[in-house]
UniProtKB/Swiss-Prot annotation:
<keyword id="KW-0949">S-adenosyl-L-methionine</keyword>
<dbReference type="GO" id="GO:0008175">
    <property type="term" value="F:tRNA methyltransferase activity"/>
</dbReference>
<dbReference type="GO" id="GO:0030488">
    <property type="term" value="P:tRNA methylation"/>
</dbReference>
<keyword id="KW-0808">Transferase</keyword>
<keyword id="KW-0819">tRNA processing</keyword>
<dbReference type="Pfam" id="PF02676">
    <property type="entry name" value="TYW3"/>
</dbReference>
<dbReference type="GO" id="GO:0031591">
    <property type="term" value="P:wybutosine biosynthetic process"/>
</dbReference>
<dbReference type="InterPro" id="IPR036602">
    <property type="entry name" value="tRNA_yW-synthesising-like_sf"/>
</dbReference>
<dbReference type="InterPro" id="IPR022908">
    <property type="entry name" value="Taw3"/>
</dbReference>
<comment type="similarity">
    <text>Belongs to the TYW3 family.</text>
</comment>
<comment type="function">
    <text>S-adenosyl-L-methionine-dependent methyltransferase that acts as a component of the wyosine derivatives biosynthesis pathway.</text>
</comment>
<keyword id="KW-0489">Methyltransferase</keyword>
<protein>
    <recommendedName>
        <fullName>tRNA(Phe) 7-((3-amino-3-carboxypropyl)-4-demethylwyosine(37)-N(4))-methyltransferase</fullName>
        <ecNumber>2.1.1.282</ecNumber>
    </recommendedName>
</protein>
<dbReference type="InterPro" id="IPR003827">
    <property type="entry name" value="tRNA_yW-synthesising"/>
</dbReference>
Amino acid sequence: MGSIEEVLLEERLIGYLDPGAEKVLARINRPSKIVSTSSCTGRITLIEGEAHWLRNGARVAYKTHHPISRSEVERVLRRGFTNLWLKVTGPILHLRVEGWQCAKSLLEAARRNGFKHSGVISIAEDSRLVIEIMSSQSMSVPLVMEGARIVGDDALDMLIEKANTILVESRIGLDTFSREVEELVECF
């Protein structure tokens, strides 16, 4: 296996990495006691279904890892969905970590940078932990319910602006977090 930069480049080229994730993940993977196992840098989705949180009752109609435009949303709205949700989620990372001190410092850095929903999700017998770093920034709002568009043009513009702001601000937090991780001496 090559350097972390080579691995990340290969994963991006085959579609495993979100756009812009390489620099952040290279920083996070620099300390020897931390290895990223999965990542999402945040995204905006338009979800068809009565309840966007149901696995079997919803499907992604549109997804982007970039700020969304009014024309992109309108193009999906014209497809005539019975129920459609606008959802934005911030970044989420899963990191395999060696040792409690490194994990504690990692979680403290995460919380300082807006990742309030972070914690230990598993502990292996060899004392390795899996940490989930999860942004608290999100938004979910219905645009269409029972075939009726419930959001007017002005409100739609405000929602799109808010979704884009959430996405951008959560990425700034991810960048700042990744820079702090590079400095965690207890993780080397």
